[in-house]
Amino acid sequence: MARVTVEDCLEKVDNRFLLVMLASKRVKQLFKGARPLIDNRGANKNVVVSLREIAAGKIGCEIGKKGR
């Protein structure tokens, strides 16, 4: 597999800080036993898997106003 870069992920998520939050949340999910949404035969670490999922468009986020 090709290397995943921050630039690949920023095509899907506009903000670097949001990217970090999204990736860290996904890493926690993977650590707790969630199944990867991409092929992980290379036994990549959870951080790499989460970034690959974001770059592939398998994971995203929505930002909206908080309701009361």
From Swiss-Prot:
Q: Which organism is it from?
A: Citrifermentans bemidjiense (strain ATCC BAA-1014 / DSM 16622 / JCM 12645 / Bem)
Transmembrane is among the record's keywords: no
Supply the name of the protein.
DNA-directed RNA polymerase subunit omega
What's one GO MF term for it?
Answer: DNA binding
**Function in brief:** Promotes RNA polymerase assembly. Latches the N- and C-terminal regions of the beta' subunit thereby facilitating its interaction with the beta and alpha subunits.
Group of enzyme by EC: transferase
Q: What GO biological process terms does the UniProt entry carry, in alphabetical order? A: DNA-templated transcription
**Record-listed E.C. numbers:** 2.7.7.6
Q: Keywords for this entry?
A: DNA-directed RNA polymerase, Nucleotidyltransferase, Transcription, Transferase
Query: Gene3D superfamilies, per this entry?
Result: 3.90.940.10
Family, according to the entry, reads as follows: Belongs to the RNA polymerase subunit omega family.
Is the keyword Transferase assigned to this protein?
A: yes
Q: Which reaction does it catalyse?
A: RNA(n) + a ribonucleoside 5'-triphosphate = RNA(n+1) + diphosphate
